[in-house]
């Protein structure tokens, strides 16, 4: 007599893992990823530009000046905005976020899963592009600093844009206003705003780990290197906390007009 055959069903995914996988599969389709890669290609062009600049004593200084204005102030926030809007804002506008919001999943898991999914995409696209730009510029010694600065800055931006997506349906418009009006214009004049800006703090991370940084990139009142990393981690946690609170009070409706 043979023993009865028993069949075991595969262990179901946890709710958090399901949110994370859904974020990567559904919220970041190929067209969105292509939109992320376009500014990343721009980062490589900035690397070529730094290589062509000949009015700096070293390639490292040339790349530092170009990266500060081109990569950390333009490429990184735009690419992170595409990611941040994809993981939440676009679904809210289309009316499909209802299906996630109405599930018996804790709000904090939805927020954290969306942020981790977006951060993963940023870490494999934006940050490597910044490091590769340093190599293209002939400043390979700064590639590690460029990767770290772009990585920390982009994941902080993703958290910020998720929070904005929980506050308003016009995520892209308000996010651009935050980046270019508040961070770039007001942040250039007011150190208090720059201290909370992913753009300015990512530049400070990059500059802090350079052996011979240009004096014009060192700004008083903003921590450099590891201090800037800690500051952006705090900004990220606060942004996620705001997103968690606001998502619990969202009033969802149909697709935006």
Regions found by a protein language model. Give the residues of each.
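Secretory targeting signals
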Residues: 41-87, 94, 111-178, 183, ...
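Aromatic- and glycine-rich beta-strand/loop motifs that create alpha-glucan
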Residues: 2-38
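Alpha-helical membrane-protein architecture signal
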Residues: 13-21, 108, 112-116, 144
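Terminal transmembrane helical anchor/hairpin motif
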Residues: 3-4, 53-62, 167, 172-257
